[in-house]
């Protein structure tokens, strides 16, 4: 292409971008924000290395509701507890759409629970919640699975006693096995190739999506499709994960008994058979594969990442670790594993777990939302179809809700009588209509794993506690703890 042709192409792109920008502005009364450039939008004001920090700084200048342009696309950004709560909870239906997230959408194509929308999302979510409840989510039966998996983890950790190790893979295998048992019908041995492959794909993709490459792809997907980089590996991983799930689905089809479903896949296949004559049915192979992927991804990475944050925090603050262990010894003792019934008798431990989730803020910007209709909001009119970013980080670090938000402080979740105190600004699983459907399972896992490990081990860092850096490595999709090793000593 010669220079003249290139110039003409760039001019056309600029005109198209400007027309899209101004047409989108004209559809409603959008909140203020930094002035966008043609094609680039607000790219110059948004550091791809740390989009969260950039948006948080802009909120201080433009207020709790403002507009940024990701390329030519306007996106509303909400910050602070009151604003986010008003959108996700008070106006839950209007803000219940799923916003554009090309990193995922180019794989899921709008199928599955996490990235579907409208009636399809409502039907899939209702079905998935019911099936997960039938298989014990939030009940004693799933607690027994967690206790069993926790005991396997403790066996592995005892073999590591006194030896430095990286906890990433050990935790991921154990946590993933719980959701695998619900989805596939049975747990895997820790050296099973299928489990190891699942963990590799999920861990690697979470890192990429939480990196600048992931952020840039979400802004300029059509451009980065032509550029080499880690995002290419991300889609290869997605494809490998899809193939693995499809293989398991075929195995289920060969042995399916509709009258005796063994797991989530069996239930979905049975529903597909029941609605196979309905051309409008949302139960098909694509939605099964993507829904299964969503469950595995969500049920593996966030809990494992939160536990790693907890390890770092407890090693940096050994007095907190010792106080938790004292409460465990007093309430549970050493002769049995902690159970969920113990939680109400362990207010300090419960407060520490909640404070870990608040402070670590694993999903700081939430998944994007979208307004489902023209929506009046705080003096503005947000047009139907506009994407919305809710900065959960600004909720968890809201000084009006937490006394010392920049510090790790379990007192945030304790009242004057040292009883556990809930906070309405606690939103690690989001809030409203799009609340993570795996929240009950994740909360159970966190409590049982956290208490079981501290009942049996003391965590020791390889460096001086004062030198432990709690600043997350990434602030994209997820806040990842910095890589570390530790020693566990049997108590």
UniProtKB/Swiss-Prot annotation:
GO-annotated biological processes: naphthalene catabolic process; response to toxic substance; trichloroethylene metabolic process
Subcellular location: Endoplasmic reticulum membrane; Microsome membrane
Xref: SUPFAM superfamilies: Cytochrome P450
Record's bilayer topology term: Peripheral membrane protein
Family: Belongs to the cytochrome P450 family.
GO MF, one annotated term: iron ion binding
Function field: Involved in the regio- and stereoselective transformation of naphthalene to trans-1R-hydroxy-2R-glutathionyl-1,2-dihydronaphthalene in the presence of glutathione and glutathione S-transferases. It specifically catalyzes the production of a very reactive and potentially toxic intermediate, the 2R,2S arene oxide, that is associated with necrosis of the unciliated bronchiolar epithelial cells or club cells in lung.
Entry binding sites for heme: 436
Cofactor(s) needed for function: heme
EC number(s) from the headed UniProt entry: 1.14.14.-
Keywords per UniProt: Endoplasmic reticulum, Heme, Iron, Membrane, Metal-binding, Microsome, Monooxygenase, Oxidoreductase
Organism expressing this protein natively: Mus musculus (Mouse)
The protein, known as: Cytochrome P450 2F2
